[in-house]
Amino acid sequence: MSPQTETKASVGFKAGVKDYKLTYYTPEYEVKDTDILAAFRVTPQPGVPPEEAGAAVAAESSTGTWTTVWTDGLTSLDRYKGRCYNIEPVAGEESQFIAYVAYPLDLFEEGSVTNMFTSIVGNVFGFKALRALRLEDLRIPNAYIKTFQGPPHGIQVERDKLNKYGRPLLGCTIKPKLGLSAKNYGRAVYECLRGGLDFTKDDENVNSQPFMRWRDRFLFCAEAIYKSQAETGEIKGHYLNATAGTCEEMMKRAVFARELGVPIVMHDYLTGGFTANTTLAHYCRDNGLLLHIHRAMHAVIDRQKNHGMHFRVLAKALRMSGGDHIHAGTVVGKLEGEREITLGFVDLLRDDFIEKDRSRGIYFTQDWVSLPGVLPVASGGIHVWHMPALTEIFGDDSVLQFGGGTLGHPWGNAPGAVANRVALEACVKARNEGRDLAVEGNEIIREASKWSPELAAACEVWKEIKFEFEAMDTL
């Protein structure tokens, strides 16, 4: 061996492979206020003890590797290693365990969701000793929260910008999602806003395609916004999707939206990536733009019960990265969402402080310190008959978004918007009078339809439409 490469590795070092649990399973560990805590659903391979599986997760997502390395002696593993500090079996599931892991804060770059996820949900999800692995929840410590800007503006600032209080906001996704020319697209936006909606929306896959380039769409939508505002006296908006193939192009679109004077832009935060999303969120705060977030691709990550990452983790990450709205399921529509679990992560988005509540899937108490809240968006297969349930489930601080439930009205787009606005106002009025929307909802809608022919027509069209499938996302 060359003198230049010879080391003293043999001093206090024994090469070879040893069980992870000898170093990374520490049930006696007392978690610190500054630790990031993670709850993993672990399914070990046959023959792998749960303690070894939990320790392997802690090791591979922090300082560990498959064999002992002599450079461990050049640092303090006790300071930097992740620790599996508790393991509990999952009730009703064979060979599944919840492994709790604590990570020292020094492992993570300040203000970077990208770096946090690269460590916690990086290579470890391909680890052979595990049949499946799912990140169920994270506890983000105050010290780390304070390194993030979070939502550009938050719920209260948005209401002040829009001058709209005391009710959910109403939106509509323009359909068909692909194929319209920019001018026809702008026409649909105008009709919906003129009919009484607060927002219209680009669909998540509307970027800048040959049939409708982004600049043309932005111009026609801005015209629709200003025309409808002048005619209704209300502040209106359209979620202009700035998502693009590069961060530079994304920012070019956001800058153009600001120059047009529109109130809000949009980003697909999972397909666009957390680095791009945080960059856009910072720009939106600095330039007075609201930021609507779509979660396209989330079900690839969160749909399977035993592998991937629960949406509550993605929701927390979005609140840190930045967004004023995010799609959060409907409970009653066509998309996945069990009621208590959905309300669990809705509260994680909106509230300043959330207590641990395992009945709603919340594994840790979370304090958001001064980070603004995010408005949950209910969207997907909803119509006027759902309005009482949506108002009761989501409350005032939400956006109720009807795409087909607006544009599918037999009389056209504007009457569809009128029907939804009348239904919402009727539900809010009834609730404020003390009526129970969960019990009297259908009767409230029928009463309102007597003096709104647009609502009556909508009620007739969608009276038989239901999406009754068992939710996959259960405890």
From Swiss-Prot:
It catalyses: 2 (2R)-3-phosphoglycerate + 2 H(+) = D-ribulose 1,5-bisphosphate + CO2 + H2O; D-ribulose 1,5-bisphosphate + O2 = 2-phosphoglycolate + (2R)-3-phosphoglycerate + 2 H(+). Substrate binds at residues 123, 173, 177, 295, 327, 379. The modification N6,N6,N6-trimethyllysine is found at residue 14. Mg(2+) binds at residues 201, 203-204. The modification N6-carboxylysine is found at residue 201. PROSITE patterns: RUBISCO_LARGE (PS00157). Keywords: Acetylation, Calvin cycle, Carbon dioxide fixation, Chloroplast, Disulfide bond, Lyase, Magnesium, Metal-binding, Methylation, Monooxygenase, Oxidoreductase, Photorespiration, Photosynthesis, Plastid. InterPro entries: RuBisCO, RuBisCo_large_chain_AS, RuBisCO_lsu_C, RuBisCO_lsu_C_sf, RuBisCO_lsu_fd_N, RuBisCO_lsu_N_sf, RuBisCO_lsuI. PANTHER family: RIBULOSE BISPHOSPHATE CARBOXYLASE, RIBULOSE BISPHOSPHATE CARBOXYLASE LARGE CHAIN. HAMAP family: RuBisCO_L_type1. This is Ribulose bisphosphate carboxylase large chain. It comes from Morus indica. The lineage of its organism: Eukaryota, Viridiplantae, Streptophyta, Embryophyta, Tracheophyta.
